[in-house]
UniProtKB/Swiss-Prot annotation:
Organism of provenance: Penaeus monodon (Giant tiger prawn)
Signal peptide from the UniProt entry: 1-22
Keyword Disulfide bond: yes
Keywords: Amidation, Carbohydrate metabolism, Cleavage on pair of basic residues, Disulfide bond, Glucose metabolism, Hormone, Neuropeptide, Secreted, Signal
SS bonds (residue pairs): C35-C71, C51-C67, C54-C80
One GO CC term on file: extracellular region
Protein name: Crustacean hyperglycemic hormones 3
Function: Hormone found in the sinus gland of isopods and decapods which controls the blood sugar level. Has a secretagogue action over the amylase released from the midgut gland. May act as a stress hormone and may be involved in the control of molting and reproduction.
PANTHER family documented for this protein: ION TRANSPORT PEPTIDE, ISOFORM C
Sites bearing Valine amide, chain numbering: V100
Main location: secreted
Amino acid sequence: MIALRLIAVTLVVAMAASTTWARSFNKRANFDPSCAGVYNRELLGRLSRLCDDCYNVFREPKVATECRNNCFYNPVFVQCLEYLIPADLHEEYQAHVQTVGK
């Protein structure tokens, strides 16, 4: 009886650990693995939204993908930044790219 309880507890702990790991893995699954800097969901989300907004303006599929290339460190991202974001915030966005990038 004690052995059965021990096995049941072990299974429950193992399942909880694997679920937590899977949830943690899935959080990062949406972002480019080339982003080798600090993982910050808020910054990555903000940069990604800029690319989404840029795609919504230009409606060209390549804009959405190229904007995110090389962890947002590319000419398309810069063009989107210049087009959509006020000039006084450009340095802030470039700092975000440096934080999450290489």
